[in-house]
Swiss-Prot record:
Keywords: Electron transport, Membrane, Mitochondrion, Mitochondrion inner membrane, NAD, Respiratory chain, Translocase, Transmembrane, Transmembrane helix, Transport, Ubiquinone. The keyword Membrane applies. The keyword Translocase applies. This is NADH-ubiquinone oxidoreductase chain 5. The lineage of its organism: Eukaryota, Metazoa, Chordata, Craniata, Vertebrata. It comes from the Eukaryota.
Amino acid sequence: MNMFPSLMLTSLLMLTLPIITTTINTHKNSTYPYYVKNIISYAFITSLIPTMMFIHSGQEMIISNWHWMTIQTLKLSLSFKLDYFSMIFVPVALFVTWSIMEFSMWYMHSDPHITQFFKYLLMFLITMMILVTANNLFQLFIGWEGVGIMSFLLISWWYGRTDANTAALQAILYNRIGDIGFIMSMAWFLFNTNSWDLQQIFSLNYNHTDLPLMGLLLAATGKSAQFGLHPWLPSAMEGPTPVSALLHSSTMVVAGVFLLIRFHPLMENNKTVQTFTLCLGAITTLFTAICALTQNDIKKIIAFSTSSQLGLMIVTIGINQPYLAFLHICTHAFFKAMLFMCSGSIIHNLNDEQDIRKMGGLFKAMPFTSTSLIIGSLALTGMPFLTGFYSKDLIIETANTSYTNAWALLITLIATSLTAAYSTRMIFFTLLGQPRSLTLITINENNPLLMNSIKRLLIGSIFAGFFISNNIYPTTIPKTTMPHYLKLTALAVTILGFMMALELSLATYNLKLKHPSSPLKFSNLLGYFPTIFHRLPPLMGLSTSQKSASLLLDLIWLEKILPKSISQFQVKTSTLVSNQKGLIKLYFLSFLVTLTLSLLLLMPHG
């Protein structure tokens, strides 16, 4: 059984080789990206061996411990937990990153710092692997903060642009709010259980776990961009497209969902936290789907679709189905990375044009990218027998047969319908109709680096869901019966979304532009959320700070307490001590009045 951790550790160590070898300069800048890509492909093949063996062995988990240090009564160890979640996730993350690395070699070929870019992407992947294999909170926190700082460095890659720097700061600040919840939970577990090992935390199973679980939910809200802490996710599109693809598919944004899956043994009996989780996910998936409907930036549409799918995963955890949430994480990684790569191909060929209103007619000019974009969008909507269907259909069916909050489940169904609507709108504006781009643009998608990377993810977007869902626990699922209308709900709402979007697009294609309506403004301006929360609190905070500083420091301390108090004290003491009051004018006036009256009285009357 030692073979499982040994092989997984081998694949992890293989990933560190390119970072270690850069200190010796064994590879030139031109060959380094190829070296990194090959290492990741070898690590993927290596990780498949223990994964296959683990699935067929029927084991529940394998834990490897190496004692690190003891702080009084707290024992810290390097502990790796190889269970179903980590054993499946690692090959998926490696496969997707392999394709993204190959795509980056085409997309970033003219970047002068491409070696550093590949190092950052590799560190991003390594920190995510540390996070998913961690068996204690301290190790998990290292991976958690690692993906956070790497996202900051990668989003601000083009640091010459103000928008990129602002977006990176926004991402790190929103994640700081989530980290408060994580640290609070770590402190609670340390004081109440005297341990950070997951197994010991779960074995104690306290009844009053509302506070740490709400802290973990806050952490997941920040990292997985749930409603309230979501604005950083669309802003993160300021980074290069390979960063967007990696960030949204198999690394940072799913870390929050993965954290909740890890702590599900504590959540499953806590109805309060489950209700909060369900409602938060439902609001997120609907709100971000509404925002995606009117966006014109192709990358922002896909970004909002990510946030909507993350909301769906949170809903799944809220209805007590962590395995289905994990299945959706794995299936979502394939088609979401492919959608970003297709958008990157379109943007690159159209001279960095991201507005879908300035595209159109690309189906003939870019047939391979167009086909991949359509298949990816269909997989996203849950079209039968594509990868997304195997997870999304199961989630909708489970939600329909659960006895929890009906309003939250209805909202989720509406969001599922809107997914089809904004996907259809994106395809309609980007690929169909007449070309609206500049006529001088030369389009060429026949680059093997681009085509091979998208091809791999295209195969994954068609077949991966079938293979992963066949190996999900429990492997022997009892046959359930449900009415046909419940079984067909997911497909029905998806088709409804397709039809609605197509009809509206065709009906409004030749209409003149009118003044935008209130619902359009609400959707296009992201529910006024960034405007209110990015302008109002800083303004109020600055004005309050300014007033308090001027009142407390200037008026009270520097004026009233020190100078004026001393002068007033001296005036009062001088008036008490001195005989003269110093009223010269009054003295002269009284003298004049007295003199006048005396003269009037003493003058002889004629």
